[in-house]
Amino acid sequence: MLLNMNLQELKQKYNYDVATKMMQQYLDIKFAHLDCLLLFRMGDFYEMFYEDAILASNVLGIALTKRGKNGEEEIAMCGVPYHALENYLTKLIEANYKVAICDQLETPEEAKNRGGYKAVVTRDVTRIITPGTIIEENLIASAEPNYLASLVIPKNKETASLCYVDLSTSEIVVVNVPETEILNELARLKPREILLSENLRSSNLADSIFKQLNFRITYQVDSFFAINKCEKIILDFYKMKDIKGIGEISSSQICAIGSVLEYLSLTQKQNIPHLPIPRIIKFHSYMTIDFSTRRNLEIVTNSQGGSQGSLLSTLNHTVTKQGGRLLYNFLSSPLTNIAKINHRLNITEFFYSNLEIVKKIRELLKKTSDIERCLTRITMNRSSGRDLLSIKYTLETATIIKGVFFDAYGFNLPDFIEKIIKPLSGDAELYNLIDETIREDAPNNLNDGGIIKHEYHPKVAQLHDLINNGKLYIEKLKDQYRKETGIDSLKISHNNVIGLFIDITAKNVNKILDPKFIHRQTTVNHVRYTTAELQKLESELVNAKTLVISLEKELYADICSQVIEKASYLRMLASSLSGLDVFCNFAYIADEYDYVKPEFTDDLSFDIVKGRHPVVEKALQRESKSFVYNDCHLSELERIWLITGPNMAGKSTFLRQNAIIAIIAQIGSFVPAKSAKIGVVDKIFSRIGAADDLIKGQSTFMAEMLETSAILAQSTKNSLIILDEVGRGTSTYDGVSIAWSVLEYIHDKLKCRCLFATHYHELTVMSNFLPALQNYTIAIEESGKDILFLHNIISGAADRSYGLHVAALAGLPASVINRAEQILLKFEKTSTGKGKNILSTESNNLSLFYLEPNKTTISSKLDKKFSTIDPDKLSPKEALELIYELKKLV
């Protein structure tokens, strides 16, 4: 509502003309930031007023008070202590609010000197915090990026441009994305905030970003993305004369980069960190994994959005924050270039062959710091001495790490390892700068003082000497004056009226002969004096704390500017350390969990021997259980495996594990298998176990069909498709028909690798006329009424779904199971016979079974229900649903 009001209307609403000067100052700043919660610094608190206060008190759970009146209404107010700001910011950002931080730009004393005792302290917004522009360690995840993205859709709409930046690490990248892949690319990046033109607010794209991905969108007017404006912003920011200095980029990429830089300028109030020139990447240089597949495979998060049980949590044994972020990026963006994949695998193999080196390096890496984010805080003037010390300790440790390699290999390291560790040589000049200037016990807050070593600057030493030894200097001066006057009882005292003074008894007044003693005050029994020397000492003592903090800030700023000059080197060092962490991590898990180096080919091979699901295997190990490994042999001649068998037997796990093995291999890691030979996968698609999406108005079947449609439209010959129970959400006949036609399309048109699990046993006959399709099933053992799932994939087809066995395992009452068995027996006696196709006209015309007529309504309903069911075709889910229906009828 406020955003739609003009300035005059706003002033009228808040009775601006009769408000106090301080409240007018608040309103002026609030009117300029209507889309933000305004935190207004007043002394030791950040205060909020009016609607902001009401909203914040609810979100933060703090007391709502009042301050004065707005006409007849009292002004709502709440506040938070300045030193606890980050704790409250976390809640506001998590609630998706933009927060404007308004700070005092001068002290109350400075305000009085400027405009008298009625002067209002100067305040202004120093930055705007949004989900995509956070740099505070406590507000962002340490082991994953925090991206702000700008998405620009050109008029032809065939290719969009996306620029994304992580302000906390100064990473900035731009990429062109096909229109059909926009959601998939956003799912890969998981940006905390997306800039989008206001013209797209009502578009299907914006709706999908918000509803399907649940990402925050910040809309900007269309002119925000204007090409001429954005080009000028880029040239000014990078101090260039020609946009070609960025590289070969399109007009829409210019708009994406420029809009990101402009947004950072607006939110950071010109205080943007030193960003490198944007890295231009090609969209097809990494594997496409759509958002549904990322969710189904639980790559970086589990199905609830947490980390436990995800592939990332299983593979992540990194020991540094930046290493954790790099692994996150690797898993989000597996490579598709064989040469680059093999380059990574060679690095992993080197460390796997040198596990003693790995052990030493991992211990040393634990002593390094997240210098990427330290550097960003330094460049944005939000650092502390501890950030500089972190850089110093990391420089020191880096040289020790390089020594580990030298001790083991001397000058005979492979070139690809030498390239990684080259930045570890350190920078003696930078190390010495920090070592000579910053105290080891430097505080977090510059205003506390004590950050600069005393010996670095004589004035700092002098001021700290005054602070620490002020009483001693007063005592020395007192002793000097006693000698000069001969008055042994002379004292130097202090009060709040005249400050420091020389105090003698009245009977000794005749001994004060030197004119340097200036009379200040006479009492009944005492006379008080001062001297220029005492006044100077007093002034120095009073101002020493303020002066030393001011001087230390100046020196600290100068030191930081020298550190910033080394930004490029520090980023290379951070990259080297994070790379070492990730590849040592790969070697560690390969050794710990018996992973093997995969081999890559340029054909459609997918030859996995004794493959395992890493997440499930780790969970079983915690229970002292073993994972049952399985082979998978896909090729040009055998591209599709049609897998039948009961639920709980391991079909879904088998499907997922092979997709995961492809992902792990293409990030450069060894894989959980005895051997692996893989033709590079350009895209992975999965459709596994979709739940009803009633909020979005989509049933299970509709969600399934939408996902399947997208898979068929976007897959290529080099893709890997895993499908589980396609067609299950509709009638049996419809489901079989859809699954049948989907398989034909994949076989005849796409000709890509596919694992297809189903309960529709009728589909197994397709192997008779689709040469690249083969039937596989899950091995089981039957003992009377009991079955044992062996979890082995074997050649052949299942002839039953074992739905009632699954229902029994689920804990249905024995009476229900027994009754279901009786009904199933009736089905089997009167069914069309095993092995016949459900699509045959005979099966459509035959009555399924006959029940003894009964005059009751229940019997009639049962008869009607059973007449529509073929028991051989029941999936476990359908059998379970049938049991519930029978229970209701009975």
Swiss-Prot record:
Keyword vocabulary terms for this entry: ATP-binding, DNA damage, DNA repair, DNA-binding, Nucleotide-binding
Binding site for ATP: 645-652
Molecular-function annotations in GO: ATP binding; ATP-dependent DNA damage sensor activity; damaged DNA binding; mismatched DNA binding
Highest taxon listed in the record's lineage: Bacteria
Claim: DNA repair is one of the keywords in the record: yes
DNA damage listed as a keyword: yes
HAMAP family for the chain: MutS
Protein name as catalogued: DNA mismatch repair protein MutS
Gene name linked to the record: mutS
